[in-house]
Amino acid sequence: VRAALLVAAAVLGATGLGLIWAARLAATRFLYVSELGAAGEPTAEVFRWGLVLVAVGALLVALGAAPLRPRLRWLAVVPPAAVLAGSAVAFGIASQVTCTVGCPLPVGPAFTWQDLIHTSCAVFGFAGAAFVMLQVAADRRFRALARFSLLSAIAVAVIAGVGGLLSVFRFGTEVGGVLELVATTIALLWLVGLAAFLAVSAVREGRVGTGMPRIPTQSQPNHAATPARVAATYSE
């Protein structure tokens, strides 16, 4: 069951990423990632479904993943599955409560509750996913997955950080938007990779758990240690 959930999560995550990229490529002008789903945009419906699939995929990973045990205490305070489930819920809300045209920051005269809810959920979901990356990077069992998660976390933190600063200061906004898309892509590829890796691990554990016990072979009489008369009987 766990393996099936994780395989489904990988498929949904990859499909969601594909829909987000399809929306971006179909856009006729430069847009930030969240702007693809803004009310009135022709890409809104495709982007919304893409984000929904990502949210469902993340939730399935949280439900089907084997318990992860980060080595560092501050990373083990909250179970990774719980953090990932929270991120999934946040992305699900952000997919339904989209930002307004232009996706303005929810401050000053441009403030709207819609933008505040969308921005808050998107930031919370992304931050939660980044935290899970660090938790998996400090896991004690899956070393290959830990290295993959560490590299993903560093890449997302650096790229998203630079893109976010450019967005806040309204400087090089086009570059900032591209960096935001790249960071989003890396994060979603990590989610797909996490689901696929844990699915393979679940399948292997299932095979070991259902393995048939080895039947000991029956020992045969040793003629050399048998008395002469018994040995003669066997030889006839």
List PLM regions with ranges:
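Actinobacteria-biased recognition of intrinsically disordered, low-complexity terminal regions
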Residues: 1-8, 198-236
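Hydrophobic, aromatic-enriched alpha-helical segments typical of multi-pass transmembrane helices
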Residues: 1-32, 36, 40-201
